[in-house]
Amino acid sequence: MSDTIQIREMMKEKKRIVVKIGSSSLQHIQTGDLDYTKLDVLVRELCDIRNRGKDVVLVTSGAVAVGRKSVMMQETGSDNLTAVKQACAAIGQARLMMTYQKIFAEYNQVAAQILMTKNTIIDNLNRFNARNTFAELFKLG
């Protein structure tokens, strides 16, 4: 049995599917820009899973890389500066969410964003609030 068939069989029994996509999977291999073809395929697959009645969570990284590319900043030693990373992340996160919103809308789905940090998990109130937000989003579809 192929890996794809095995994964699909396992997913049939699951209520909630979490998919993690990293920076390198978001970027076009030649240009380093967002790879819209890959993103469209990803979103189409996620919407198909959602249409089968599953809860779907997409965990995405790449905000720093997208932001850096947006302002044409090369990766340098200065990227270690927290302020530089945060500025690139702020730019990139907005661009990522705009892209996801547009693609999900093509499939009549709504995208939402929950930004989480280590503190979201460690702090009881923050964890409670994040959990409630997820629960409400799942209820809303």
Predicted regions mapped to residue ranges:
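Nucleotide/pyrophosphate-binding catalytic subdomain
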Residues: 1-141
